[in-house]
Amino acid sequence: MEMLNVTVNGIAVSVPKGATILEAARAAGVEIPTLCYMKEKNEIGACRICVVEATGARGLVTACVYPVTEGMAIQTNTPKVRAARKTTLELILSTHDMNCLSCSRSTNCELQKLCLEYGVDSHAFEGFKPTYELDYSTPHLVRDNNKCILCRRCVAVCEEQYVAVIGANNRGIDTNCSLHTATQRRQRIHLLLSLTRWGVE
């Protein structure tokens, strides 16, 4: 197996070719925050919290999907990186339900933890805030899109089970993860099964 030599915050580490920056950082013992990442399930870089600086890249890159190259120098905690993460958190909170005290994840919330670490509150961006009614349309799921941060973890896990009942719908500020229609489900399951038959993951 071909190994690549990189540095993460000055720490030298060797990782297999094809490894991501996130994997290299973890091998070096460096923590990079993530909200959407789930190894081998949801590696899409949707949340943008894992951005880092890397030599050879034109701007900040998402560590969970960006592959390392030989000799790459990665910086995970520069002022530029911290500012980008803070802005991303502020944007997430701009449309987020801030009733943390009544939330079952309060004090065990990845978003809450990162907001405290980066000094983020809910007032950086004001404007239109979509609101959603609780979705009790199935006996198996209760959806509260007011708390959804669009990480798409639920979508990835659902698709892995070839259920495809949940998906990202609409666009822009109206994007939400919600139940697919029967037609959307059939189309998505057909696509997933076709890709599996062809060996595409």
Can you say where each PLM-predicted feature lies in the sequence?
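Extended, non-catalytic structural segments that build the interaction scaffolds
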Residues: 9-11, 143-144
